[in-house]
UniProtKB/Swiss-Prot annotation:
This is Probable Fe(2+)-trafficking protein. It comes from Stenotrophomonas maltophilia (strain R551-3). GO terms for biological process: cellular response to oxidative stress. It comes from the Bacteria. It holds the Pfam family Iron_traffic. Keywords: Iron. SUPFAM superfamilies: YggX-like. GO terms for cellular component: cytosol. Could be a mediator in iron transactions between iron acquisition and iron-requiring processes, such as synthesis and/or repair of Fe-S clusters in biosynthetic enzymes. NCBIfam families: PRK05408.1 (NF003817). One of its GO terms (molecular function) is iron ion binding.
Amino acid sequence: MSRTVFCQYEQRDAEGLDFVPYPGELGQRIFNNIGKQAWAAWLAHQTMLINENRLSPRTPEHRAFLEGELVKFLFEKDAEKPAGFTPEA
C-alpha cells in the first residue's frame, strides 16, 4: 500500500516516496513532504544542472551547489535553468 503525503512542491496530496532519498534531516524532510512525481521532476532538473554546468557529484563544492538547488527546487520554487540553457526541439 502506498503512502500519501501533502506534497509541498505540487501543493496537493500525492503518492509518497517509498524510501528516504537523501541523507540526514533534508532526506527526512523530502520523505515527509515530497511526492514521487515531484522527486522525479527534481531528478530530471538535477541531471540538467549536472550536464549543463559540467558538475561532478564527487566534488564537495558541486554537491553543496546541488543540495542548495534541491532545496530551492522542491521547497522554495526558486530554481532556475542554467544560463544559456535551450531545450532540444
